[in-house]
């Protein structure tokens, strides 16, 4: 008998700490890949490629969000079929050309193409690191684990946005700011190939602890079978109240992020702020977002998911409205910090709620569907903000997004039920599973 066969798989953060910590580091590198664009690319569009229309400038976010959304869906399906690690490695291979294209792109079309590749890279790598951590920790500390995961990723987004802003102010918008991306891609690929281990077996082990039931039809009859991908899509998008509530909230959350990524830097620069100060503002939002998740992820394990999701969406709406209504570095810095706090309440909690409800046997695909809708928010937000900013004013676009965000929070309040057993009197009801309270 081999050592691997004689050692039973164990769920839990402490039991899998080394591999979990490695995946946190890998996810930080994933975040750094997107962070290299947060400050520089909107300014590159305006200053070097002479794009004046918001709809033209934001095409890179539309390309990124559309491709990442679809890739998320396939990442979940592929990771169930071929394993998590091959999908992770493929994502890093696709990401290697991205910083090189951004350095030397002769036209804006090449920048858009680089973001197509970045969308695939992010969809494969971030999805699989999320799924792998969920596999490893089991159900008890899922929110805490997602908080650490997202804190690492968005902490790296913030640090890289700040660093690239500093570099760009002193030596130019390119190529030097994108040297960081070259280092991130090489290190991420090396760690994933050499040290990351497959975790699909942990999900299969957890699945043996659950009854495999799902809705057979609209009458809710439960049957012991694995649902089809189409059924999982419908459950996560429409039919299951908690899953669908999380999907719409995730979409609106990233609609906000698309606005912050593509519109805010141009608004700040047009107001006369230096590239360095724009970089600071671009970093504050993901920095608070990232650091806050270290607390909010674990908090959702104690007080439940619903309150944090609804409260976070309403906090984001207030912050976006504040940014639209005020002017100046200090006021905008405050708005960015509050926006980051609201996002920190929502981001790890949404993915933890998906993990609460979805059965381990089809959880990766449910995560993929959720992330499809969530990252479609990038594209929808860029299109909406671009059209409104060009037709009216950037302020009109920002106010509209604030209203949509508030409406999303109200939907969560009215439709979602609490999914975490520690915060709910009843046990979690899987789709179609008939559960009685103790």
What are these regions, as identified by a protein language model?
Residues 114-154, 352-353:
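Cytoplasmic helix-loop-helix junction between adjacent transmembrane helices
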């Amino acid at each position: 008998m081999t050592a691997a066969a004689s050692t039973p798989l164990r769920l839990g953060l402490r039991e899998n700490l080394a591999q979990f910590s490695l995946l946190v580091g890998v996810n930080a590198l994933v975040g750094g890949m997107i962070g290299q664009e947060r400050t520089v690319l909107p300014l590159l569009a305006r200053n070097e490629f002479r794009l004046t229309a918001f709809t033209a400038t934001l095409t890179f976010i539309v390309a990124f969000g559309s491709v990442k959304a679809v890739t998320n869906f396939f990442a979940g399906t592929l990771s169930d079929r071929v394993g998590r690690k091959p999908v992770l490695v493929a994502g890093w291979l696709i990401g290697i050309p991205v910083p090189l294209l951004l350095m030397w792109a002769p036209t804006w079309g090449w920048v858009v193409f680089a973001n197509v590749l970045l969308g695939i890279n992010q969809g494969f790598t971030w999805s699989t690191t999320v799924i792998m951590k969920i596999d490893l920790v089991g159900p008890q500390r899922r929110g805490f684990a997602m908080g650490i995961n997202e804190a690492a990723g968005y902490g790296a987004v913030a640090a890289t946005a700040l660093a690239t802003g500093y570099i760009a102010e002193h030596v130019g918008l390119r190529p030097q700011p994108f040297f960081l991306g070259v280092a991130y891609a090489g290190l991420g690929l090396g760690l994933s190939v050499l040290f990351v281990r497959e975790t699909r077996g942990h999900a299969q082990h957890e699945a043996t602890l659950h009854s495999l039931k799902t809705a057979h039809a609209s009458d809710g009859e439960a049957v012991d079978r694995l649902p089809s991908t189409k059924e999982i899509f419908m459950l996560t998008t429409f039919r299951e109240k908690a899953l669908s509530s999380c999907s719409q909230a995730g979409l609106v959350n990233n609609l906000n992020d698309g606005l912050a990524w593509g519109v805010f830097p141009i608004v700040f620069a047009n107001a006369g702020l230096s590239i360095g100060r724009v970089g600071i503002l671009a970093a504050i939002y993901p920095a608070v977002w990232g650091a806050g998740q270290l607390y909010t992820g674990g908090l959702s394990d104690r007080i439940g998911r619903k309150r944090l999701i609804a409260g976070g969406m309403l906090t984001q709406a207030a912050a976006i409205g504040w940014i639209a209504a005020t002017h100046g570095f200090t006021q905008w810095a405050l708005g960015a910090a509050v926006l980051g706090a609201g996002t920190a309440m929502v981001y790890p909690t949404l993915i933890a709620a998906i993990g609460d409800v979805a059965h381990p046997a089809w959880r990766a695909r449910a995560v993929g569907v959720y992330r499809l809708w969530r990252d479609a928010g990038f594209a929808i937000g860029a299109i909406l903000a671009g059209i409104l900013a060009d037709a009216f004013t950037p302020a009109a676009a920002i106010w509209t997004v604030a209203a949509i965000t508030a409406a999303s929070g109200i939907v969560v309040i009215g439709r979602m039920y609490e999914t975490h057993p520690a915060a709910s009197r009843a046990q979690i009801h899987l789709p179609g599973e008939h559960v009685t309270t103790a």
